[in-house]
Amino acid sequence: GGPSQKQKQHKVNLVNIKVYI
């Protein structure tokens, strides 16, 4: 995906890690 806001990037990071594993 593409984090538009930096604040949302934090939430996307957690989800990305889960999908990455």
Swiss-Prot record:
The keyword Transport is assigned to this record: yes
Regions crossing the membrane: none
Coiled-coil segments: none
Keyword Transport carried by entry: yes
Main location: secreted
Superkingdom assignment: Eukaryota
UniProtKB keywords: Copper, Oxygen transport, Secreted, Transport
One function term, GO molecular function aspect: oxygen carrier activity
Function field: Hemocyanins are copper-containing oxygen carriers occurring freely dissolved in the hemolymph of many mollusks and arthropods.
Family: Belongs to the tyrosinase family. Hemocyanin subfamily.
Name this polypeptide is given: Hemocyanin subunit 6
Organism: Maja squinado
